[in-house]
């Protein structure tokens, strides 16, 4: 159990939303098209191509993350209640869905039709939707007196409500473990090698628990000696930065490990690689926020974020009940 500051918790949660909003306009674009259409992302921008969202607005990454914030705030001591509570939150959000991925949409449609949360998750799509929403679970783990086995038994079922593929769950567990690890550190105490070893160990352990292939841990291993490489080279080492869990999450981890002390530079550099940029942005934002705290984010990012007051209130509510 770690003595976690409220600012660090806000950093992990609101950092998710900031990264999501920065990446929103270029979601799905190649790096070349990011350069062509946007000349690179340096601030919140309207989505000029799709025209559906404006500068500072966020997508499903933030919707799903804060759905879990509300679940954990309501049931901080009852992980067994989380899957059913998540169902209520997810189904309620259907009318407000923002760019939900196919995996999430399929699962929540099943839930709305009466499928149980134990069976609703999609078992054959190894996408990154579990990882994108895992920050609140890492916060919960960091603030509770639970060991790794108990934390895993709490985290896995609620992520599996939408994503049951073992590789998706490995990445989801990895993101929770990353936030858990970084909440115990600061930019001054961060050690890259120790962080990377922890991420590789977390992925390898989860793969064993889930009887999963080594698609996540092998990507991390492939990145081990390349953490000073350029972002585009890290992308290539991951075989891309699309929606596959074994691409997006290892890339986000590598970007944070590469320059963890540079919050703004790291987040923008990773997002501008393109691909599933709102989700890699959300995951990087959560990790960097856990390490640096919310106060370290640029004021224009704080003020320009959609519904910042509501998100801050919900994040503070979780911080208080976990206190």
Where are these regions (language model features)?
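Structured, active/binding-site neighborhoods that engage oxygen-rich ligands
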Residues: 1-323
